[in-house]
Structure formats: structure tokens, C-alpha cells
């Protein structure tokens, strides 16, 4: 149906999250209609991002610098941390412009069915960081799901011995069970942050 190079482009685009066959086809046809200079710029941007963007050694955010801009910022409140499952959730929290503390990205949620446990996430790094830096409050901005609940409680259990007085809270209302944090609008997230509850 398609010439081999076009079929290969469609196949590669389909590997991206949220891209089905029809969307991949539309994107591929759009891309081959663009001037060569635009395609070269896109390819160069992809390669540059892949070669230069790494995890921050402190919070595990994606960054071209280490530590990341958030961890380096003197305007951030080092006593207040937000624990998120993924960088997409960090970005969602930043869009609210309400959270002024630091972050810790776990790298996912505990999911025994998918073979994801404590050792596959940045939980031990969080425990060591809390013991070392002694924040006053940890806000869990974790999507309300079974995996999210399990992850929050496991992290809490790991932290209790090293930080027995650490206040641990979670986002409040506005996030229905099973929803993804990254898709919540800024107002809902800001209100959930403001009305956070003890964990």
C-alpha cells in the first residue's frame, strides 16, 4: 500500500505513546510534505534531546544540566517536597504555578502485575535524600489508583524509620479514582494542592 520508506516511517511513529495507525499515517504524510530543512531541524532536535537530556541526579527530573534547574533554584522552598510518579506529573504540577518546593520523581508506580517493585523505582534514593536533607513536608501528587495508593503507603512505610516527624500529605479533592494526574487541569490541581490531606 505504501512505499517502503513511508511504511517504515508510519511504523516508527506508531511506537510513540498515544499514536495509533491513523494518526501515524497523518503525521507521516504531513512530514513528507514539509520542506527538507524542517525535517532536518526536527531530526536534529530529536538527536540533541536524546544525547543531552538526562535524569537529574537529585530528583530524577529530565534535564540537560545536573542538577536540574528546579534543584538549583534558590527561590525554591527546600523544606517542602512533592513526590510524583513521572516527569509528566512534575510538569502538570509546575503548570499550576502554586507549588514552590522541590520534587522527587519515583519513575513509576509499584505494580507487581507488571514486575515493578521498590527496586525498579527511585524509592531508596528518596529515603536517603530525606534522611540527608530533612524536609518538613512531603506532598504525594500521585494519581488516585490502586497502584498509586500502594506506592504512597510503601513509601510512607520506608520513610517512617528515617523521618518519624516528617509530615506526609496527599492531594485532596478534584481527582477522581483512576484518573491520571498529567491530564488534570491547572485549577483542579491547584485546589487539590491547597486542600491536601494527611496521608
Curated annotation (Swiss-Prot):
It comes from the Bacteria. SMART domains: HhH1, TOPRIM. A zinc finger (C4-type) spans 56-71. CDD domains: TOPRIM_recR. Keywords: DNA damage, DNA recombination, DNA repair, Metal-binding, Zinc, Zinc-finger. The keyword Transferase does not apply. Residues 79-174 form the Toprim domain. GO terms for molecular function: DNA binding; zinc ion binding. GO terms for biological process: DNA recombination; DNA repair. Disulfide bonds: none annotated. Transmembrane segments: none annotated. The keyword Zinc-finger applies. May play a role in DNA repair. It seems to be involved in an RecBC-independent recombinational process of DNA repair. It may act with RecF and RecO. Belongs to the RecR family. This is Recombination protein RecR. The lineage of its organism: Bacteria, Bacillati, Cyanobacteriota, Cyanophyceae, Synechococcales.
Amino acid at each position: 500500500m505504501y512505499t517502503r520508506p513511508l511504511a517504515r516511517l508510519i511504523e516508527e511513529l506508531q511506537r510513540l505513546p498515544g499514536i495509533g495507525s491513523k494518526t501515524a499515517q497523518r503525521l507521516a504524510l504531513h512530514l513528507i510534505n514539509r520542506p527538507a530543512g524542517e525535517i532536518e531541524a526536527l531530526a536534529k532536535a530529536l538527536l540533541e534531546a536524546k544525547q543531552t537530556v538526562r535524569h537529574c541526579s537529585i530528583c530524577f527530573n529530565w534535564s540537560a544540566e545536573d542538577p536540574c534547574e528546579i534543584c538549583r533554584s534558590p527561590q525554591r522552598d527546600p523544606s517542602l517536597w512533592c513526590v510524583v510518579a513521572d516527569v509528566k506529573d512534575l510538569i502538570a504540577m509546575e503548570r499550576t504555578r502554586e507549588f514552590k518546593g522541590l520534587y522527587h520523581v519515583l519513575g513509576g508506580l509499584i505494580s507487581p502485575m507488571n514486575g515493578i517493585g521498590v527496586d525498579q523505582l527511585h524509592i531508596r534514593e528518596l529515603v536517603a535524600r530525606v534522611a540527608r536533607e530533612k524536609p518538613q513536608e512531603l506532598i504525594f501528587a500521585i494519581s488516585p489508583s490502586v497502584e498509586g495508593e500502594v506506592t504512597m503507603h510503601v513509601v510512607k512505610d520506608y520513610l517512617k524509620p528515617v523521618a518519624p516527624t516528617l509530615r506526609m500529605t496527599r492531594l485532596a479533592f478534584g481527582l477522581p479514582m483512576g484518573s491520571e494526574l498529567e491530564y488534570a487541569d491547572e485549577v483542579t490541581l491547584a485546589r487539590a494542592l491547597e486542600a491536601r490531606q494527611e496521608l
